[in-house]
């Protein structure tokens, strides 16, 4: 995932930052607890395509899958 693209993409709901989960190929919004898929290297930023993340388990942007 291109670092420049990650800098400009935001959650379509809250406009908050997204964190790249390399292993799952998803962009995560911790505020809304949503994960947006990345398909063939293209982020799918449609709310209908997002999945709910596990409640109470925020993605750590500094972790192994962090941006």
UniProtKB/Swiss-Prot annotation:
Family membership noted in the UniProt record: Belongs to the UPF0434 family.
Entry superkingdom: Bacteria
InterPro entries for the chain: Trm112-like
Cellular component terms (Gene Ontology): cytosol
Pfam short name (any one): Trm112p
Protein name: UPF0434 protein Bcep1808_2639
